[in-house]
Amino acid sequence: CNSKGMNATALTYKLDASNKRILDVSRDALLRIFTCAYAYRMTGDAKYLTKAETDMNAVCNFPDWNSKRHFLDVGEMATAVAFGYDWLYNELSAATRTKAANALLKFAFQQAQDKNWNLNFYEATNNWNQVCNGGLVCAALASYENNPSEAKDMIEKALESNKPALEVMYSPDGNYPEGSGYWCYGTLYQVLMLAALNSTLGTDNGLSDTPGFSKTAEYMLYMTGLNSKFFNYSDCAPSSTAALASWWFADKYSNPSLLYNELKMLKNGEYASCAENRLLPMIMAFANNLNLDAISAPSNKLWSGKGETPVVMVHTDWTYTDTDKYLGIKGGKAGSSHGHMDAGSFVYDAYGVRWSMDFGLQSYTTLESKLSALGGNLWDMGQNSMRWDVFRLNNLNHSTISINDARHRVNGVATLTTTINTATELGATFDLTEVVSDQAASATRTVKIVNDKDLVVMDEIKARTDKSAKVRWCG
């Protein structure tokens, strides 16, 4: 809650360029209220209390929190008001407390109970389930005494709907289908919800025991390559950012080594611009019981995970110098949430250069408007969707196999068949047959680092009897 935040103009209800979201407003509100509430609790300086209360009143005076168009906005706004209400309860005016409790009821709880809205976040197996449920649970726990029936309903629905989502997103090994950027987002809200449940009710009802969930911070540890770049498959940007949820896992499992990359980023000043900085003060609570003085590098060079989007990542020595080489390879399918036609693609870092790369996501707002003007829908994941006309999203842009310049099959799954982990070779083989089955009889790809210095890519493709196979791929 710095001088820029303290002097920021009043929060106003404003849809973004897509006329669909107020998500930026919700996130700005969360940044202001959460950080100022934290600053007040740490310093006792009334200016932070005043600013947080002003911003709480502003958003509680909105006509709604945009539940009709984009319920994700509600999840983040409910989180903002919940933390302000809970952390500042004794110091807030009675009028503000009443207004906040009423807003949570009217704009969040009742909207989550209204069948007129698209409430598919309850059935979703992606970050929406985590963010919307996480925000609603925090709000329900904070204001339970005011609206016990609705709050109880929010908590019970979250416990019921979140468990199957976790099983899809993290089982069996912890790798996250939507990639690094959405791990930082969705998993952060997930641990926020778990921490709130445990601190208030003494249990998370077994959610944290979901197979693979305890391993997911290690997956994220291996997702960072050289030069501060993620293995950025799916709708994710290449620049690495703070994985704030890793602090919860380090505390939960008494394993500070999970913070090897986080401490490096923190010391380099990279946390100052982290994507999820609106919840940055959380790490202070999670770090309270950790010894951060001597954290060693991971002992294993390779990490592999199966599940919806199987991946294999390699760091040859974890020094982030010229002796360290980094490789990330993925399988899965384009039809997954935020998926690209990138099954079989890989990134490779060596000697300060990302030799094989992924462009990553493109602005949703611009793509939505452009495709809509052409009669398309960015979020239509069907085989013939205009989504796949976008160069960044189709296979012709990725370092995977393309045959006869045809699109990958959106529901074809590339499976991890072999993990290569020997003294001289590190990598994996994926079977891409389903992905290209309309163009080839079979296809496999092997990518490996040999002797910690050479990259080998080997594709084995068997043509169909009824057509030739013109093969291409780019890096």
Residues of each region from the PLM?
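Hydrophobic alpha-helical membrane-insertion signals
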Residues: 1-5
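Aromatic-lined, polymer-binding surfaces characteristic
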Residues: 6-14, 18-226, 236-237
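Extended polysaccharide-engagement surfaces of secreted carbohydrate-active enzymes
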Residues: 178, 182-475
